[in-house]
């Protein structure tokens, strides 16, 4: 390929961002590199850009969200988009409208980007098949949460300088976590080594097939790791009793300094939020200004979502047809 041909290649050759699965290391690196530029832009007094001027972004969240929804809203507005937050609680969905009918209705309004979070795995891909615009998965069931994995990767890369060769332990409720799945896929693709640490009741069957090491003991699982990523107990997705009690869970799996001591001396701590202090993480560890990256993750989230919106918008046509489909 000539240099001229390379310049004609799209930054991110995908119409949608439905998951980390299917992305190449080059795709991931391109998004992270672009996000790096937005980190610096967001630290300026004038944060406003214009790459989405004239574009319409719809945020469609079927599940409650603080960080992700506000982050996408801020990202779109900083890029100059017209942003609409659709309230599902007051929409036709509450009157029995199907997801497909919702998709067809929204598509008729000619949006350019739809960001969707849904409680059912696969719902985002279904919607993407019915619309003409670009779709971004903001979390679907226990399936994927791609922008969370990207922001976690950016946070790690900016602090450690790389992803390849790092040992990352993901600890907690792996069974119900879309964050865990997306992070496993991304970290493996970028050459990191991934461990999962959890009681057997909170691990999905066949998790080893994703290329992770499995531990049931925190001391052994954290031995020599570079990054400790804690996950909350997703009680809202639990139909039965997965742990004896939250107090006992913290005793065995909650991250405190005693357990963190098994990791490398310069190991860093992450959490996608929201946190349950005293359940999966001790407050002192969560608030440690030297070792906790939790606040940095929030900052990186806006930059990553700006990068994703920017990258997808470059592939948008100037005129959108009524008939939809995914590519």
Swiss-Prot record:
Identification of the protein by name: Aspartate carbamoyltransferase catalytic subunit
Q: What's a Gene Ontology MF term here?
A: aspartate carbamoyltransferase activity
**Which pathway does it serve?**
Pyrimidine metabolism; UMP biosynthesis via de novo pathway; (S)-dihydroorotate from bicarbonate: step 2/3
What keywords sit in the KW lines? Pyrimidine biosynthesis, Transferase
Positions that bind L-aspartate = 95, 178, 232
Catalytic activity, per the record? Answer: carbamoyl phosphate + L-aspartate = N-carbamoyl-L-aspartate + phosphate + H(+)
Enzyme Commission number? 2.1.3.2
């Amino acid at each position: 390929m000539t240099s001229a041909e390379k310049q004609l290649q799209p930054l991110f050759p995908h119409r949608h961002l439905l998951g980390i699965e299917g992305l190449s290391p080059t795709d991931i690196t391109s998004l992270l590199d672009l996000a790096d530029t937005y980190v610096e832009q967001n630290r300026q007094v004038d944060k406003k850009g214009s790459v989405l001027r004239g574009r319409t972004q719809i945020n469609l969240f079927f599940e409650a969200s603080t960080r992700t929804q506000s982050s996408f809203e801020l990202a779109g507005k900083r890029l100059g988009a017209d942003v609409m937050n659709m309230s599902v609680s007051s929409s036709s969905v509450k009157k029995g409208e199907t997801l497909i009918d919702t998709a067809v209705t929204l598509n008729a309004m000619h949006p350019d980007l739809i960001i969707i979070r849904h409680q059912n795995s696969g719902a985002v891909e279904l919607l993407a098949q019915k619309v003409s615009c670009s779709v971004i998965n903001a979390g679907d069931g226990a399936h994927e949460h791609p922008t969370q994995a990207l922001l976690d990767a950016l946070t790690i890369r900016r602090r450690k300088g790389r992803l390849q060769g790092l040992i990352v332990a993901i600890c907690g409720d792996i069974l119900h976590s879309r964050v865990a799945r997306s992070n496993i896929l991304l970290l493996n693709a970028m050459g990191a080594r991934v461990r999962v640490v959890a009681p057997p009741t909170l691990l999905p069957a066949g998790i080893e097939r994703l290329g992770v090491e499995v531990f049931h003991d925190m001391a052994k699982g954290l031995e020599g790791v570079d990054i400790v990523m804690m996950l909350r107990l997703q009680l809202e997705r639990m139909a039965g009793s997965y742990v004896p009690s939250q107090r006992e869970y913290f005793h065995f799996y909650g991250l405190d300094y005693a357990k963190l001591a098994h990791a490398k001396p310069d190991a860093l701590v992450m959490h996608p939020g929201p946190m349950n202090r005293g359940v999966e993480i001790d407050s002192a560890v969560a608030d440690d200004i030297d070792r906790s990256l939790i606040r940095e993750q929030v900052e990186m989230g806006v930059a990553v979502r700006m990068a994703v919106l920017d990258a997808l918008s470059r592939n948008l046509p100037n005129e959108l047809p009524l008939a939809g489909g995914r590519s």
